[in-house]
Regions:
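N-terminal glycine-rich, Lys/His-bearing helix-loop that initiates the first secondary-structure elements
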Residues: 1-98, 167
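General beta-strand structural signal in soluble alpha/beta enzymes
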Residues: 46, 104-109, 131-132, 152, ...
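Active-site phosphate-binding strand-loop segment of PLP-dependent enzymes
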Residues: 51, 151, 155-186
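Short loop-beta-helix segment that forms the pyridoxal 5′-phosphate
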Residues: 79-83, 94-117
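Short acidic loop-to-helix transition motifs that present clustered carboxylates
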Residues: 112-114, 136, 156-160
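Conserved PLP-anchoring active-site segment centered on the Schiff-base-forming lysine
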Residues: 118-137
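Short, structured coil segments at secondary-structure junctions
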Residues: 125, 145-147
Length: 186
């Protein structure tokens, strides 16, 4: 069984390579920043990282992470709601809430997780979510995971958005989901 599958996958991979669609992994050998070295020391500009604020190599944050590892160890060892919430999480969430003058804050390990988990607890099948067609995959996944009736409008097309709003008029709540920076179409 495995022999046939391996043979099939080998042919598929060869076809992908022949079509010029094979993606070689770039190995970054420097800290994440705007200019990085990859593979055998090739210097390139990094336009694809999620390091939007340049915080991944901020020395104060690196030192804070080292201090946290010294006092709390490495990693949460579980998801937050089982036994992964530590006092450091609650302290940071309180500081963020205080800074933004909000009632509470919930930290997620990644924005993908935050977007994926946003809509489901807020919306029911009585509601509507109206999503821009070029939203990030994480927003699209979050929309798919919720029970709300789903509508999609053409990217930044206000007339199409208005059409969706009219179609969803009978729903209890109508929420528009749009990206801050549309990154999914290059």
């Amino acid at each position: 069984m495995y022999g046939k599958m391996k043979e099939f996958l080998t042919k598929e991979l060869a076809g992908i390579k022949e079509a010029g669609l094979y993606k070689n992994e770039r190995i970054i050998t420097t800290p994440q920043k705007a200019d990085i070295k990859v593979n055998a020391g090739e210097e390139v500009l990094n336009f694809c990282a999620n390091n939007y604020l340049g915080l991944s190599n901020n020395q104060r944050l690196i030192q804070a992470a080292k201090d946290a590892m010294d006092s709390h160890g490495f990693g949460m060892s579980s998801v937050r709601f089982i036994c992964g919430t530590q006092d450091l999480h609650k302290q940071l969430e309180a500081a963020i809430s205080d800074y933004f003058k909000t009632e509470d804050t919930i930290l997620y390990a990644a924005c993908f997780d935050a977007n994926g988990g946003l809509f489901e607890p807020l919306l029911t099948d009585e509601d509507a979510i109206i999503s821009d067609a070029l939203n990030h995959a994480s927003i699209i996944d979050g929309v798919r995971l919720c029970k709300a009736k789903r509508y999609r409008y053409a990217n930044a097309d206000m007339a199409d958005l208005e059409r969706c709003l009219q179609e969803a008029q009978a729903q209890r709540h109508r929420i528009i989901a749009t990206d801050g920076v549309f990154s999914m179409d290059g």
